Amino acid sequence: MGVKTLFNGARFVGQAEGDRRKYYVFDAASGYLVAAPQAPHSYSVTVIQRDAPEVISNKFRGTQITVSTLKAKGHRPDLFDRYFDRLNALYVMVALGKARKLKKRLGKAMLFKISSAK
């Protein structure tokens, strides 16, 4: 996947509220694009593979998880190896309405409740 085709067909699907900023999620041919504001008029973009939300839904349906849970129990290093890939995959879940970020925490870790609906 090259930068020239990264944004082909991208359409906005939703947003997720993080601790410090909002994350904007787009569905594109290359996967889900998560855009996070970095400075005025500047965004960073992370690509999340298309099958990540389905894997999370199937594995963790109806449970509360943290970013670390994805690494320990996700069993998909191709999807969940790096910390920010795991975090952004959870933000994609929130934007798609398949999860919600809880106000409570597990220690310092953010908790996400994965929807029990298919």
Question: Whereabouts are the PLM-identified features?
Answer:
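Short, cationic-aromatic polyanion-contact patches
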Residues: 104-118
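Short amphipathic alpha-helical interface segments
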Residues: 1-81
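A short, conserved structural fragment
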Residues: 94-107
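Short amphipathic alpha-helical interaction segments
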Residues: 78-96
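Generic low-polarity alpha-helical segments
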Residues: 70, 89, 100, 117-118
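Generic structural signal for short, flexible, solvent-exposed coil/loop and linker residues
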Residues: 2, 54, 87-88, 101
